[in-house]
Amino acid sequence: MAKPLTERFFIPKEVKVMGRWSVEDVTVEDPSLKPYINLDARILPHSHGRYAKKPFGKANVHIVERLINKVMRSGASHYKAGGHFMRREHRSIMSKKMKAYEVVKEAFMIIERRTKQNPIQVLVKAIENSAPREDTTTIAFGGIRYHMSVDVSPLRRLDIALKNIALGASIKCYRNKTTYAQALAEEIIAAANKDPKSFAYSKKEEIERIAQSSR
């Protein structure tokens, strides 16, 4: 007779992200972002691209995996950020998900040491503080173009926040001795505390200020 699964395999009582951090106590205070911030319990945040071609499929991707995917981006390639074009600065982790995974894991360990909090909760708070509620779009009326304030959808708010957090980390470690993991940890902590030194938080304030003037 075959032995039960609990004797044949190691089955953990609690599934923790990266084997270290629980998501059971992580809360999302923003009601519009709550349905789109995926906090499912899983050890390895990797979906193998199964939601890539599905409408609104990004809502099913774990929030830590979405951060890892943004870390793999090349930086500001068509415009200046922090006064620099940074397309080739972090090419060592571009399209290399395992390296990006290790960078995010190291950043989370730094956040845990500095804040004594669950780094996933700090990340969620940083996203909430960096997600703009308003933006501007261009409309044409009578041959003249105008800027008009519009509401931002929750999924786009999440995209903008994660993109700017990763880009802010790239700016902080551009051509200096700061590692990307250290810069990412500093950016997430600053955004969670609404610190103006955070690129993501200051960018959100700038977007909303421009949108308010275009009402």
Curated annotation (Swiss-Prot):
InterPro entries: Ribosomal_uS7 (IPR000235), Ribosomal_uS7_arc (IPR026018), Ribosomal_uS7_dom (IPR023798), Ribosomal_uS7_dom_sf (IPR036823), Ribosomal_uS7_euk/arc (IPR005716). Part of the 30S ribosomal subunit. HAMAP family: Ribosomal_uS7_A. It comes from Thermococcus kodakarensis (strain ATCC BAA-918 / JCM 12380 / KOD1) (Pyrococcus kodakaraensis (strain KOD1)). The keyword Secreted does not apply. GO terms for cellular component: cytosolic small ribosomal subunit; ribosome. Keywords: Ribonucleoprotein, Ribosomal protein, RNA-binding, rRNA-binding. The keyword Glycoprotein does not apply. Belongs to the universal ribosomal protein uS7 family. One of its GO terms (biological process) is ribosomal small subunit assembly. One of the primary rRNA binding proteins, it binds directly to 16S rRNA where it nucleates assembly of the head domain of the 30S subunit. Is located at the subunit interface close to the decoding center. This is Small ribosomal subunit protein uS7. It comes from the Archaea. NCBIfam families: PRK04027.1, uS7_euk_arch. One of its GO terms (molecular function) is mRNA binding.
